[in-house]
């Protein structure tokens, strides 16, 4: 559904309009790889070093790693209107400072997009709604795994429609902003 380009379109319009963007990164450090238990997807992410970083206080090995930003997003994330929160560890923002940053900057409305619809995006939506935020989701600026008998994207769309204040397309958000 053109997720990567649609997320870029959201970054672009936010930059043009001076809208603050909050990025909730997913990082694992060495100590995270020694957990006594984990879910099947966590096991996979750890095995393929999907979001691994050398440490919280170093950029060593970050460039080009699974934790690095997509090249087309770097010019936006390095911009003045972007706040990168502390990392989340599983799927939602319960383990980072996203809600704190939103509140401290005076935001009560969130337009949510992200790479993993039924995991990180949905978990962020649920937690932010439960924390009192007015959350809308951009349904074509997120995607999910589709496997035999498992359609993560369709599952997420059902929950977006049931929980979010509004479900937009990228085109609708760009026009609305």
Segments from the language model and where they lie:
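Active-site-adjacent betaalpha module
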Residues: 13-17, 34-35, 40-177
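Histidine-centered active-site/metal-ligand motif
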Residues: 26-28, 124
């Amino acid at each position: 559904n053109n997720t990567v380009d649609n997320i870029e379109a959201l970054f672009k319009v936010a930059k043009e309009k001076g809208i603050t963007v909050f990025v909730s990164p997913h990082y694992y450090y060495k100590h995270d790889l020694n957990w006594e238990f984990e879910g099947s997807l966590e096991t996979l992410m750890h095995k393929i070093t999907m979001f691994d970083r050398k440490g919280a206080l170093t950029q060593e090995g970050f460039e080009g790693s699974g934790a690095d930003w997509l090249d087309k997003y770097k010019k936006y994330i390095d911009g003045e209107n972007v706040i990168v929160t502390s990392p989340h560890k599983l799927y939602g923002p319960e383990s980072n400072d996203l809600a704190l940053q939103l509140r401290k900057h005076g935001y009560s409305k969130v337009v949510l997009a992200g790479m993993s619809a039924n995991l990180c995006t949905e978990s962020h939506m649920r937690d932010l709604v439960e924390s009192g935020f007015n959350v809308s989701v951009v349904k074509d600026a997120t995607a999910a795994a589709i496997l035999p008998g498992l359609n993560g994207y369709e599952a997420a769309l059902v929950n977006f429609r049931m929980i979010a204040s509004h479900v937009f397309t990228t085109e609708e958000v760009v026009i609305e902003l």
